[in-house]
Amino acid sequence: GCPLGFHQNRRSCYWFSTIKSSFAEAAGYCRYLESHLAIISNKDEDSFIRGYATRLGEAFNYWLGASDLNIEGRWLWEGQRRMNYTNWSPGQPDNAGGIEHCLELRRDLGNYLWNDYQCQKPSHFICEKERIPYTNSLHANLQQRDSLHANLQQR
């Protein structure tokens, strides 16, 4: 399953922030939650994230885990992973003013598409972590319960 506050889609769990942070702060916050800024690998994942963001009903924009901070125009996911799937808004990325280097999921005319944006600007963000297969998480919980039970019996 997924930790409290995370939402499941296939093998991943996603957390949609209610707070706004710069790109770097958002990445740090996701690490604190033992996750990373969301990486969108395919259309299915994109549809889930866009659908969930839309259902939240807030016209928020969200940081995703990619930038072209290293080489202008070379967009990579966190961990230097190449982008095999993209869903840029028409005319994006445009590096407006020469200072847009971080990937934002932007609500435009009621639809969520990708946009490059200034990394230091505050935005909402989406964290992603791998889902723990249910059997393992249940087993871990039972182990914790058993060791807790054993500790209590020793007292």
From Swiss-Prot:
<keyword id="KW-1015">Disulfide bond</keyword>
<dbReference type="InterPro" id="IPR001304">
    <property type="entry name" value="C-type_lectin-like"/>
</dbReference>
<comment type="function">
    <text>May promote nucleation and/or growth of calcium carbonate crystals. Binds to D-galactose and D-mannose/D-glucose.</text>
</comment>
<keyword id="KW-0325">Glycoprotein</keyword>
<dbReference type="InterPro" id="IPR018378">
    <property type="entry name" value="C-type_lectin_CS"/>
</dbReference>
<feature type="disulfide bond">
    <location>
        <begin position="30"/>
        <end position="127"/>
    </location>
</feature>
<dbReference type="InterPro" id="IPR016187">
    <property type="entry name" value="CTDL_fold"/>
</dbReference>
<feature type="repeat" description="2">
    <location>
        <begin position="146"/>
        <end position="155"/>
    </location>
</feature>
<feature type="disulfide bond">
    <location>
        <begin position="2"/>
        <end position="13"/>
    </location>
</feature>
<feature type="glycosylation site" description="N-linked (GlcNAc...) asparagine">
    <location>
        <position position="84"/>
    </location>
</feature>
<feature type="domain" description="C-type lectin">
    <location>
        <begin position="9"/>
        <end position="128"/>
    </location>
</feature>
<dbReference type="GO" id="GO:0030246">
    <property type="term" value="F:carbohydrate binding"/>
</dbReference>
<feature type="disulfide bond">
    <location>
        <begin position="102"/>
        <end position="119"/>
    </location>
</feature>
<keyword id="KW-0677">Repeat</keyword>
<keyword id="KW-0430">Lectin</keyword>
<feature type="repeat" description="1">
    <location>
        <begin position="136"/>
        <end position="145"/>
    </location>
</feature>
<dbReference type="InterPro" id="IPR016186">
    <property type="entry name" value="C-type_lectin-like/link_sf"/>
</dbReference>
<protein>
    <recommendedName>
        <fullName>Perlucin</fullName>
    </recommendedName>
</protein>
<dbReference type="InterPro" id="IPR050111">
    <property type="entry name" value="C-type_lectin/snaclec_domain"/>
</dbReference>
<dbReference type="Pfam" id="PF00059">
    <property type="entry name" value="Lectin_C"/>
</dbReference>
